[in-house]
């Protein structure tokens, strides 16, 4: 079966076959597609963008699109249509991407360039206040005293959407694993809204569209609260979410009880998908109908995982996609 048959709603013509990479449904879920880039493609990309350090991409934002163009050219123009169609397709909307040969922390700069190329073939990554850049790198170790669950290794980080506490459209999230040592557990956890057993009940609840207050801890470096509902709709009236349990501030008993029930329903879903992500690989998902989290790690004094994230908006005809944000 051609994996392209998974994509139900085309926004631009698909190539007959991918060039320079393969595409197939993942073992974990037919909604999550695996793109694997050939070593030759990756090496050619690394060589072609060697003239620009990551700092150049930080300072000159148009270069982020240029490295995307280079990667698409190496794939003979077949990559951008696949990325766009997949990220916008309600039936899929998620990818696990592996560039063969980029699998060591010493190649971290090339990993950032490669992920940036993919992200900027579909849109643009937003400013990340935590890092002051269009991406953020952070480390998880065995002990943690931070002010959110992002770096806490020995507990599950609950399912959530990104961008809930900023006034920016967050259509996609990209999560790259740069390095890990002495690591057991810690798989990515995913849930597609259309697979969540109780989605319809919560979506139809009177509180689903009530504007709520969202605030972030100091580490996020976001000073102002934002206000929005937990649920919204896409252009076809299907549910979308902007939700994270840590940062929503219920105004009263009614809201608090409903939010607790919503959290318990998400965490108790039997449709959660556990996805191992190798060093150098990354997830690229639609942030509005996929929720993501992380399973707990097994304690180890030498535990270390370094991650990078990008999150942003899809720069393709918006009326075809998302309204209400």
UniProtKB/Swiss-Prot annotation:
EC assignment: 1.14.11.64
Phenotype of null mutants: Deletion mutant shows an increased lag time when grown on either L-lysine or 5-aminovalerate (5AVA).
Residues that bind Fe cation: 160, 162, 292
GO biological process annotation, one example: L-lysine catabolic process
GO molecular function: ferrous iron binding; glutarate dioxygenase activity; oxidoreductase activity, acting on paired donors, with incorporation or reduction of molecular oxygen, with 2-oxoglutarate as one donor, and the other dehydrogenated
Top-level division of the source organism's lineage: Bacteria
Cofactor: binding comment: Binds 1 Fe(2+) ion per subunit.
Keyword line: Dioxygenase, Iron, Metal-binding, Oxidoreductase
Induction profile: Induced when grown on glutarate, and also moderately up-regulated by 5-aminovalerate (5AVA) and L-lysine.
Transmembrane segments: none
Annotated metabolic or biological route of this protein: Amino-acid degradation
Catalysed reactions, as listed in the record: glutarate + 2-oxoglutarate + O2 = (S)-2-hydroxyglutarate + succinate + CO2
Cofactor(s) it depends on: Fe(2+)
Classification via Pfam families: CsiD
Family: Belongs to the glutarate hydroxylase family.
Function in brief: Acts as an alpha-ketoglutarate-dependent dioxygenase catalyzing hydroxylation of glutarate (GA) to L-2-hydroxyglutarate (L2HG). Functions in a L-lysine degradation pathway that proceeds via cadaverine, glutarate and L-2-hydroxyglutarate. Is extremely specific for glutarate, but it can use both 2-oxoglutarate and 2-oxoadipate (2OA) as a cosubstrate for L2HG formation.
Quaternary assembly: Homotetramer.
Protein's recorded name: Glutarate 2-hydroxylase
Originating organism: Pseudomonas putida (strain ATCC 47054 / DSM 6125 / CFBP 8728 / NCIMB 11950 / KT2440)
